[in-house]
Amino acid sequence: GLMNACEEAIKKENIPYQKGGTYVVMEGPQFSTLAESSLYRSWKADVIGMTNMPEAKLAREAEIRYASVSMVTDYDCWHPDHENVDVQQVIKVLLGNAVKAKNMIKNLIDGFENHIDPKDPTNNCLDVAIITAPEKRTQKTKDKLKTVAGRVLKK
């Protein structure tokens, strides 16, 4: 699936990575306070970020495969051996991560067809997701949603 394709693309770039983990999303842009950072660590969170939700849920609803590749910029403020988060340092790491991400995406595109799974439940999750009865769906609504739900709205 998509995660395996991402992993293969990352390996081609020799980027250190960790597969799996718990992601905490916070509204941003902002940096965590020490109290927030400590709370997230008490939850055993691996990464704290400002994206991924609601994107992951919306992608699933549109039968779009979604994988998160989080490229870390800092340790947040909890780490005793690192200084507090500094915007300039974050930007420097972010720019380096952007280069890595572009190369990873090129590799992902090149090898993606090897990872397509016809049995992936993402292919048909809309079959059981639409609550509105077919006779209650207006043509205007079907036209509006045809790009993301046309397959099931034709039924």
Language-model regions: role of each:
Residues G1-P80, Q88-L95, I105-D110, K119-K155:
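Glycine-rich phosphate- or other oxyanion-binding loops that anchor nucleotides, phosphorylated ligands
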